[in-house]
């Protein structure tokens, strides 16, 4: 059997529970045709780069699948008939990714809780520049400044 990564986008107005039900429907199709789903990742609701069928956001879900091509074809056919699925993409891969996907790792990296204060970064005045002149506010207002 071949290995696949399948990502589908569900409409923003369906609940997370309905997205889980969709995933279970896909699992049933795959398993009935002799395959299995190795991993399911729900990435949450994300903003789309452009509108798809009048939706600006969508639920993203990743499935790692080990199944024959006939099972994938049937799952894609059922997905395209479902009005809650906006887009889908299935890619054949050589090996399934172990652990979290890049999107889930990105979510963990976004915390940035341990960053120090950036401030002036410990730099002093630049020796290659002379000191700044004091600003003359009266001259700036006469010249039509803001």
Swiss-Prot record:
Sorted UniProt keywords: Ribonucleoprotein, Ribosomal protein, RNA-binding, rRNA-binding
InterPro entries according to UniProt: Ribosomal_bS6 (IPR000529), Ribosomal_bS6_sf (IPR035980), Ribosomal_S6_plastid/chlpt (IPR020814), Transl_elong_EF1B/ribsomal_bS6 (IPR014717)
GO-annotated molecular function: small ribosomal subunit rRNA binding; structural constituent of ribosome
Presence of keyword Manganese: no
Pfam assignment, any one: Ribosomal_S6
Location of region: Disordered: 100-146
Biased composition (Basic and acidic residues): 105-138
Any single biological process term in GO: translation
NCBIfam families from the UniProt entry: S6
The protein's role, per its UniProt record: Binds together with bS18 to 16S ribosomal RNA.
Protein name in UniProt: Small ribosomal subunit protein bS6
Species: Methylocella silvestris (strain DSM 15510 / CIP 108128 / LMG 27833 / NCIMB 13906 / BL2)
Source organism phylogeny: Bacteria, Pseudomonadati, Pseudomonadota, Alphaproteobacteria, Hyphomicrobiales
Encoding gene, per UniProt annotation: rpsF
